[in-house]
Structure formats: structure tokens, C-alpha cells
Amino acid sequence: MADYEELDGVRTWYQEHGDGEALVLLHPGGAGVDARAFGPNLGALAARFHVYTPERRGHGHTADVEGPITFDAMARDTIAFLERVVGGPAHLVGCSDGATVALLVALRRPDLTRRVVLVAGVFHHDGWVPTAIDPDNEPPERFARLYGEVSPDGIQHYPVVVAKLAQMHTQEPTLAANDLNEVTSRTLVMVGDDDEVTLEHAIATYRGLPDAELTVVPGTSHGLLVEKPTLCNGIIVEFLTTDPVATMAPIRRAT
């Protein structure tokens, strides 16, 4: 089922799938990138959860609005979505920009956050491999086509969103590793072993979170969820549905 919800001036498109505990999927960022990115993952998650797939401002079926696109604004939109559409706390599974949004929501509104999965996301923009956010890099042509297929703003607005997101990615986010200590939700950090997010940054994210687990998916890139969907789906579902095991030789988790 597809619908729209007005969130403080942003007419936000979303779909709902499945039954169970609420889970909000937060898609990657980029003009031409939207909830369609979760095609290989949606079925496995909707088999266990009530899945919501909102599309953020300037992405997919949700129109752009005046002013810059910022992580702060997208986090506010997501909090409003949780309050008004979901109606309470949910698991958050975010990929790339969606992971950063999920992290900000977890920091600001722990009352609306159950477990969190951060897939290939950053807490500071220096966590990207430099070529990943080089504003001089032209996006692949297919993204313009994907944008034009669904955007209410039309294909002519595509360069505007490209420019807004390029500016955002070189300046945001700006959290420090010690800020992550304020996250109270149990969190899974996932990254590809050849990701646009550096392994060092993924490890810093894991170490900064007080209750975290880390997965490095072998043989994958920034597109790990679509490159190895069966493996990634299984890891995510297990994390969201099971309690931590008592490990035999804990170091970080030693009490």
C-alpha cells in the first residue's frame, strides 16, 4: 500500500508491507536513489516485520523543498514519520545516508528507537573514501533515468538535487566518535569489505557505540545489500529477532 503523509511541509511518500513489529527502512541517498534500492531485501524483512519504506525529501516520489537538503532536516522528517505514521517506536534499518539518518534519530529520540542497523553509513563525512563524495564526479546516467521515472518534480529538477546532495556530503554529518556513546539502542554496524565507507570508520562507529555488533560482509562494496542479499537479510533478521549470546572469551563486552 502506497500513501503520502504531510510532515511539516514535506509531502512524504511511503509504503507498508507485512505484519509484526514496526521496522522503518531508510534508503540510501542520491538523486535517483529511493526505496526501490531495497528490492532484494523487502520480502525477507516483510515476512517478519511490519515494514515502512518512506522516501525522504528530494528522493523517489517525495518532492524536493526549498532550501538545502541536510541530515538534520531528514532526521526531523523521520522523527515526525515515526510519531504520526508509525505511531511509536520502531526498529530502524538504514543504508548509506539512511544509516546516518537512523543514527541521528537514535541519538535524538531513543523513545522512538528499538534496535538499529547501520549499513555502510558514516557519523562524520571524513568516513567516506574521498572519491565517493568528490563533487566533480558525475553520477551514472541511470540515476537520472530512475529519478525521472518517479519524481513529482520531473527530470528537469534532477541537477538541482544532485547539487544539493553533493554539498551535503562534503559538509555533513559532523558527529564525533564520543557522541555515539549517547546511543542507547542495541546497534548492528554493517559494511562491505570494499566499501565507500572506510573500514577504519566502520570500526570507529562500532567502538563508539556502547551496545554494538560489527559485520564486515566479504566480497561486497557499498552495494552489499543487493550484492549478497541472502546473507545480509539473514544477518539483519537474526540481529533484530534474537538476543545477544554470552560469548566464551569477551574482551570489549567483559563486565
What residue ranges belong to the model's regions?
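Conserved HGGG/HGGXW glycine-rich cap/lid loop of the alpha/beta-hydrolase fold
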Residues: 8-63
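Active-site loop/oxyanion-hole signature of alpha/beta-hydrolase fold enzymes
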Residues: 39, 43-46, 52-93
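Flexible "cap/lid" loop of the alpha/beta hydrolase fold
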Residues: 100-108, 112-146
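Active-site nucleophile elbow and catalytic-triad environment of alpha/beta-hydrolase enzymes
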Residues: 163-179
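Short beta-strand/loop motif that positions the catalytic acidic residue
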Residues: 183, 189-191
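Conserved alpha/beta-hydrolase "acid-adjacent" motif
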Residues: 196-201
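Catalytic active-site module of serine/aspartate enzymes centered on a nucleophile-bearing elbow/loop
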Residues: 218-255
